[in-house]
Amino acid sequence: MESNKQPRKIQLYTKEFYATCTLGGIIACGPTHSSITPLDLVKCRLQVNPKLYTSNLQGFRKIIANEGWKKVYTGFGATFVGYSLQGAGKYGGYEYFKHLYSSWLSPGVTVYLMASATAEFLADIMLCPFEAIKVKQQTTMPPFCNNVVDGWKKMYAESGGMKAFYKGIVPLWCRQIPYTMCKFTSFEKIVQKIYSVLPKKKEEMNALQQISVSFVGGYLAGILCAAVSHPADVMVSKINSERKANESMSVASKRIYQKIGFTGLWNGLMVRIVMIGTLTSFQWLIYDSFKAYVGLPTTG
């Protein structure tokens, strides 16, 4: 006998809704970030030593020739774990804080900025230890560890605790919070603009059409994000690889800036634009596809 029972719909702004968005963030961020590990590896090494490779392609060739093809995925494990946790906090947190702040303020740019900043601040606390392992693994040759578990044990033993995992937390916040504020706010506004010029209203479009808008909006938002957050991204790489024992964050940042100058803050920008543009578009594609699959409205 055929059942006429309708699938249970997830109610907005319930615990189930936020748990679903959190899961969507994990699916959107962990696989996408780890899939571009080879690009990230070359970018990080060029940020630390701009003379190491003459181009990205030459970087890949040298890594494969000198270290083997598997080494282009150095840092994959730490990236996957770290950004899965970060994606959970970022997307789930954004949905929660956007709704919370909208009950206090009129919905709009201010709410998007506040919600994304709060969510990213908390998400980075989960990301930071794995980002530290990844950067150290990618910028030491040969890599100082074989995998994320090995890296965790070594860094914990070297510092005698959790201190080494969080020495880059302030630069990470400086990189990620502006990036995420730009990512979510520009995405929301770009998507709203796209919908405003299309012949159909969003509510009249099918899921595939809405997801296509999310993909385009995500790529455009990603380009802006890359430019906004790149100088801090360079400093995160430098501090994690070059900060001296017992050196304060401000002293380390000042010393590194004096060494590389303003232009050095933009090393690897074009790679990052391609990387972040692609990354952001696919994250929004995956996240909104997941939301549509479980019966939730897409973002924007």
Swiss-Prot record:
Chain positions of Solcar repeats: 16-100, 107-193, 209-293
Membrane topology annotation: Multi-pass membrane protein
Any one GO biological process: intracellular copper ion homeostasis
SUPFAM superfamilies with a match to the protein in the record: Mitochondrial carrier (SSF103506)
Residue ranges crossing the lipid bilayer per the database entry: 22-42, 70-89, 108-128, 171-192, 211-231, 260-280
Record's subcellular location: Mitochondrion inner membrane
GO molecular function term, any single one: phosphate transmembrane transporter activity
Alphabetic keyword roster: Acetylation, Membrane, Mitochondrion, Mitochondrion inner membrane, Repeat, Transmembrane, Transmembrane helix, Transport
Record-level GO cellular component terms: mitochondrial inner membrane; mitochondrion
Modification N-acetylmethionine occurs at: M1
Signal peptide location: none
InterPro entries: Mitochondrial_sb/sol_carrier, Mt_carrier_dom_sf, SLC25A3/Pic2/Mir1-like
Function: Transport of phosphate groups from the cytosol to the mitochondrial matrix.
Other comments on record: Present with 2360 molecules/cell in log phase SD medium.
Recorded family membership: Belongs to the mitochondrial carrier (TC 2.A.29) family.
PANTHER family: SOLUTE CARRIER FAMILY 25 (MITOCHONDRIAL CARRIER PHOSPHATE CARRIER), MEMBER 3, LIKE-RELATED-RELATED, SOLUTE CARRIER FAMILY 25 MEMBER 3
Stated name of the protein: Mitochondrial phosphate carrier protein 2
Gene: PIC2
